[in-house]
Swiss-Prot record:
One GO term describing the cellular component: cytoplasm
Organism in which the protein naturally occurs: Cereibacter sphaeroides (strain ATCC 17023 / DSM 158 / JCM 6121 / CCUG 31486 / LMG 2827 / NBRC 12203 / NCIMB 8253 / ATH 2.4.1.)
Gene Ontology terms, MF aspect: ATP binding; histidine-tRNA ligase activity
Similarity-based family: Belongs to the class-II aminoacyl-tRNA synthetase family.
GO aspect biological process, one term: histidyl-tRNA aminoacylation
SUPFAM superfamilies: Class II aaRS ABD-related, Class II aaRS and biotin synthetases
Organism domain of life: Bacteria
CDD domains: HisRS-like_core, HisRS_anticodon
Cellular localisation: Cytoplasm
Catalytic activity: tRNA(His) + L-histidine + ATP = L-histidyl-tRNA(His) + AMP + diphosphate + H(+)
Pfam family, one: HGTP_anticodon
Record's keyword terms, sorted: Aminoacyl-tRNA synthetase, ATP-binding, Cytoplasm, Ligase, Nucleotide-binding, Protein biosynthesis
Protein name: Histidine--tRNA ligase
Length: 494
């Protein structure tokens, strides 16, 4: 007789696109974020925690680099008919908070936020539906000093978590400069911003693909179009060769110094008022960073930074890790970007009708943690707690007292709470917990007022082939007076 479907046991499995985080994954991420938070705190930023759930209306259209930002969320309709969704980033909740509490918050408002976000997108290798973000934003300041501060803070954050100078670079660009270039190229009319909007969209998407398509592919998209390897044709912006040359010149404008780069950009933007304003902003940012000691070894003006230019309205920044790693096929490649941000106006305008400038940065937490592991700054096997074993069930109070003493001394310790019948299983448990030391006291040791400390780390080394001399110089098991338990464990751990 077939079992009733209602009685079928549920499958114990993680939903597609999600993952579970255990022990070291959690502690390493927390340690990294704590270090970043300390930098943000030092810069005067306050923490903000918002609900994981927002109204779909409040989420709005703040997701960068996606043509249809209202799609791809985990949403549902509540009993009142309101549509709710899990937040897909940390910027949209900030927009709502800045509008809702605008009369209570200081202006400018400086906040940082860290936490998971959710996107209902097709999962793939390294692409999950839940991931962590770490943002810092200044809301309410139009000064480019706020942008310079974000760049400096990002540089400090990378260094404090273990990315040394020389292994990263923060690159700065400006959307206004690109707009000036497009004005010179004839695809932006300041008196009629809607004119050539479609062409500008194609230009932005084309230059954003420079790393993947190369100069030839981008030139094709700026012109009539491009046919890919599969034969699919993508329509281009329809720019002439002269117009395309102006755009490509913008992307190749970086020179050896910030001043030389700015001079080249001024040539490209010509008489464009907006373009000249953007160049001036880049010069000011470079000057403000220079007086603080952030030289070109850490932060540079680089017009080749194009990611996010379709979203941001002014300065744009990207942190790129420059050291090499091996990909899944064993080939060397540069690690790449781990953070990005920029200035975006009208953060709360759709809520209040008032224009509010803002600038900020978002760190890809999982990517940065992967970078630290690649550099050997994270991913090391975490040490477990000292395990106090149980030899006599009727002496649990004695064992609990030992655990308490170790904990009060600041040591991580736990009492074995499984079935104590098989002592071998207790040591296997300690090994599984990566415990460095096991504390043992049977009735004989208790009568003599001693405890036995088993050095599990040394024991593993001996099992792996330590020399006889090493074994003799440091025995893997020692007997110490019960009163010296804490000191002896501390010595063994050191």
């Amino acid at each position: 007789m077939a079992k009733d479907k209602a009685s079928r046991r549920p499958r114990a499995e993680t939903p597609k696109g999600f993952r579970d985080y255990f022990g070291a994954d959690v502690t390493e991420r927390k340690a990294m974020l704590d270090a970043v938070a300390e930098v943000y705190h030092r810069y005067g930023f306050d923490p903000l925690e918002t609900s994981a759930v927002e109204t779909v209306e409040a989420l709005g259209k703040f997701l960068p680099d996606v043509d249809r930002p209202n799609e791809g969320v985990f949403g549902w309709q509540d009993e009142d008919g309101d549509w709710l969704a899990l937040r897909y980033d940390l910027t949209a909740p900030l927009a709502r908070v800045a509008a809702q509490f605008r009369n209570d918050l200081p202006s400018p408002y400086r906040r940082y936020a860290m936490g998971p976000v959710w996107r209902n997108e097709k999962p793939g290798p390294g692409r999950f539906r839940q991931f962590y973000q770490c943002d810092a934003d200044t809301v309410g300041s139009a000064s480019v000093a706020a942008d310079a501060e974000i760049c400096a803070m990002l540089s400090d954050a990378l260094e404090v978590v273990g990315i040394p100078r020389g292994d990263y670079i923060v690159r700065v660009n400006n959307r206004k400069v690109l707009n000036g270039v497009m004005e010179v190229a004839g695809v932006l009319d300041p008196s009629d911003p809607a004119k050539f909007e479609a062409e500008r969209g194609i230009v932005l998407r084309a230059i954003d693909k420079i790393d993947r398509l190369g100069e030839t592919g981008v030139r094709a998209l700026l012109g009539s179009g491009r046919k890919d390897e599969s034969g699919d044709f993508t329509k281009g912006a329809g720019l002439s060769d002269e117009q395309a040359e102006v755009v490509m010149g913008f992307m190749a404008a970086r020179r050896d110094t910030g001043a030389a780069t700015a001079a080249r950009l001024r040539e490209l933007v010509g008489a464009s008022t907006l373009g000249c304003e953007g160049v001036q902003e880049l010069e000011t940012i470079a000057e403000l960073l220079d007086v603080q000691g952030y030289g070109p070894d850490r932060i540079v003006v680089d017009p080749s930074v194009v990611r996010g230019l379709g979203y941001y309205t002014g300065p744009v920044f990207e942190a790129e890790l420059t050291f090499e790693i091996l990909d899944e096929k064993g080939r060397k490649r540069q690690f790449g970007s781990v953070a990005g941000g920029g200035r975006y106006d009208d953060l709360v305008k759709r809520f209040t009708g008032q224009s509010v400038p803002a600038t900020g940065v978002s760190i890809g937490v999982d990517r940065l943690l992967a970078a630290l592991r690649a550099k050997g700054r994270a991913g090391a096997e975490a040490q477990g707690p000292v395990v106090v074993t149980v030899m006599d069930r009727d002496r649990m109070g004695d064992y609990m007292a030992m655990v308490g003493e170790l904990r009060r001394a600041g040591l991580r310790a736990e009492l074995y709470l499984g079935n104590p019948k098989n002592f071998g299983n207790q040591l296997k448990y300690a090994d599984a917990r990566k415990s460095p030391v096991a504390v043992i006291q049977g009735s004989d040791e208790a009568a003599r007022g001693v405890v036995v400390l088993k050095d599990l780390v040394l024991g593993a080394q001996i099992a792996a082939g330590a020399s006889l001399e090493e074994w003799k110089s440091r025995p893997a098991q020692v007997e110490v007076p019960r009163a010296d338990l804490v000191r002896a464990v501390q010595d063994m751990l050191s």
